[in-house]
């Protein structure tokens, strides 16, 4: 049975996953750093991360349930539905292939706080650069997106296999570079998350199924509920936010947060579990 400390950790990490999964600030990076600070790492933490990520995906499915139901029921009759399915397949492909080929290397060498912090800073600088460019909109809605640009967004998404990069950040900023409107870039990022994250979660489950323990189910449920609720809030909030604002605030957050982690790591003020 989970004790109070474990329950608190589950709630904190669930909220961290949900809030950060669909913001351009890297959920994986935040989970690695939060887990290190809380001392919640190791095999149980690895399985727990899979569970709360699944809950975050389900929040997007719930938010877009009407649209997804319509696409599934009309994919054989409506060109717009077929186009969205093709675009999602094109966007999913790069990360699927590269993730399968380099799964062991990514999990073994890149999942550490210094990589995360460095990627946060670099990603923040790239977002600032993207926001200072003149943004010409050639694709105002997701329905206007073609498969070639969807594939290009998919290659941007593949960069997010480096923890700290941010899947949503890479796809949204990639979409802006390719001429998508802010809302279209955010919506396509959310929709692309569904096949991408389901596949990644399923593959993680396949690789780590032996680590599951029935006794941990209550803890997973607590974290999952927190992740689902906060992810739903984050998705709805970001869609409203991007219709009126740019991503500069997220860029500065990444730079400051990543800089603090690097400074505390190399000064020895915080033990991030790495040697230097």
Curated annotation (Swiss-Prot):
E.C. numbers: 3.6.1.27
Name recorded for this polypeptide: Undecaprenyl-diphosphatase
Main function: Catalyzes the dephosphorylation of undecaprenyl diphosphate (UPP). Confers resistance to bacitracin.
Localization terms from the record: Cell inner membrane
Family, similarity comment: Belongs to the UppP family.
Superkingdom per UniProt: Bacteria
Disulfides per UniProt: none
Organism phylogeny: Bacteria, Pseudomonadati, Pseudomonadota, Betaproteobacteria, Nitrosomonadales
Subcellular location, principal: membrane
Enzymatic reactions: di-trans,octa-cis-undecaprenyl diphosphate + H2O = di-trans,octa-cis-undecaprenyl phosphate + phosphate + H(+)
Xref: Pfam families: BacA
């Amino acid at each position: 049975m989970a004790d109070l400390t474990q329950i608190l950790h589950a709630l904190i990490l669930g909220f961290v996953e949900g809030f950060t999964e669909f913001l351009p600030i890297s959920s994986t990076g935040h989970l690695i750093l939060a887990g290190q600070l809380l001392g919640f790492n190791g095999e149980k933490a690895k399985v727990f991360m899979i569970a709360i990520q699944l809950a975050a995906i389900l929040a997007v499915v719930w938010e877009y349930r009407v649209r997804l139901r319509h696409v599934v029921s009309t994919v054989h009759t409506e060109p717009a539905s077929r186009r969205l399915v093709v675009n999602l397949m094109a966007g999913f492909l790069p990360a699927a292939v590269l993730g399968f080929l380099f799964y062991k290397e990514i999990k073994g060498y890149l999942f550490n706080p210094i990589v995360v912090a460095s990627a946060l800073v670099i990603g923040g600088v790239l977002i600032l650069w993207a926001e200072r460019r003149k943004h010409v909109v050639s694709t105002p809605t997701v329905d206007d997106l073609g498969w070639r640009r969807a594939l290009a967004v998919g290659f941007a998404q593949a960069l997010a296999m480096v923890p700290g990069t941010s899947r949503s950040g890479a796809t949204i900023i990639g979409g802006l570079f390719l001429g998508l409107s802010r809302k279209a870039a955010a919506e396509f990022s959310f929709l692309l998350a569904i096949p991408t994250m389901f596949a990644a979660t399923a593959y993680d489950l396949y690789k780590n199924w032996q680590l599951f323990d029935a006794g941990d189910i209550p803890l997973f449920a607590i974290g999952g509920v927190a992740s689902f609720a906060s992810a739903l809030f984050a998705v709805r909030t970001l869609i409203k936010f991007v219709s009126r604002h740019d991503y500069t605030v997220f860029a500065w957050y990444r730079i400051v947060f990543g800089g603090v982690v690097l400074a505390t790591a190399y000064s020895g003020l915080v033990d991030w579990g790495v040697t230097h």
